Amino acid sequence: MSDVSFHDLSSLDATQRSSLLKRAEADLSVFVEKVRPIIQAVKDEGDAALIRFARELDKANVAEGGLQVSEAEFDAAFDKVEKDVVESIGFGIDNIRRFHEEQKPETMWLKEVRPGAYAGDRYTPIASVALYVPRGKGAFPSVTMMTSVPAVIAGVPQIAIVTPPTSDGSVDAATLVAARLAGVHTVYKCGGAQAVAAVAYGTETVKPALKIVGPGSPWVVAAKSELSSIINTGLPAGPSEAIIFADDSVDGGLAALDLLIEAEHGPDSSAYLVTHSRKVAEAALAALPQHWSRMTEQRVEFSRAVLTGKRGGIVLTASLEDSYRFINDYAPEHLEILSKEPFAHLGHITEAAEILMGPHTPVTLANFVLGPNAVLPTSRWARTYGPLSVTDFVKRSSVGYVTSAAYPELAKHARRLARYEGFSSHENAVSEIRDRYLAG
């Protein structure tokens, strides 16, 4: 397919190469201006604003008093979803739970740093969190699974899902099934900027939360940015992105198959096949039409927009080292290492949020059922952030305990440093003044 973007990295100058790293980063300032009146309306009007915006923005008819999913709606969801899909949701949740249980930190640890002086950490769950589950380009029970399971494992006492309603005012049935199987029992029918505002400020129905996590549209991202001083907005998760890295040991047709996984998400996604093998690159190009013939019309449209645009296609490198360098510069959300010897490449990759190794580990498995979390940092934030985890739902407190035997030595050194930095009350608190109180 000659219209698929093909980038020979060795022929590009620094500016052209840098342009390949750009994502679909919307001008948030435009959206911030748009979300401000929405946020203010929700703050001032509560439920009435949510119902109005559901009608105006989501084209959904949510009845007054119907913003929270009822028990009857939860029960009905299991009848609406095919049994094999319910089974697969349960299978995925089981694996996600097994993986995330390993992340749960011990409640407290203490280290004796000096005889009689102890320092450590204590972990407690965040009191309340909101989980954002988008609906813009489809239904995503998988996002419900990925956000709900670690929150439940962390022991968060108040967990609520916010998700845009459908036109009849209901919530996607599979999303409700996933919520119930994961252990979440509160779901609110609101999405977009209005949902972020609702969980930040609270309404008559929606309880306020201390943190919100989950991917969303530019409207959601802008609302999170605007409300970041009110509610913790979690890791930056924007439009989906992936690199399929293939060496010369795999078929280019397989690389093309996996390239389309990310490209079909939407026209704002980013997806590259990176290889130093021209044979693999050409085979991938040749295989794309056959793969497109097996996709729905909408997903073909989405993936073609990505692969023929500025944020997708094939990147041919001069060597393996050049491939590694490009991948680390790009810092992808998802990285597949397509190779018969994937572990030989792993040590060269330092900047990727998710690394899936070998021809039997496509992104599809990780998105749904493998276990690692699929809510991941995008837009090169993999350089400083990691995947959503149990630790995103707990907070850490430092703990210190000093015995009477250890106190004098620590006090002596602390007193010297307090005096040097000019803090007289600090110094007094570990001086003979304290000794007199302790003795008396």
UniProtKB/Swiss-Prot annotation:
List of catalytic residues: 333 (proton acceptor), 334 (proton acceptor)
Coiled-coil-forming residues are none
GO BP terms: L-histidine biosynthetic process
The UniProt record gives the binding positions of Zn(2+) as 265, 426
Q: Give the matching InterPro entries.
A: Ald_DH/histidinol_DH, Histidinol_DH_CS, Histidinol_DH_monofunct, Hstdl_DH
In the record, the note on similarity to other proteins reads: Belongs to the histidinol dehydrogenase family.
What name appears for this protein in its UniProt entry? Histidinol dehydrogenase homolog 2
Give the taxonomic lineage as stored in the record. Answer: Bacteria, Pseudomonadati, Pseudomonadota, Alphaproteobacteria, Hyphomicrobiales
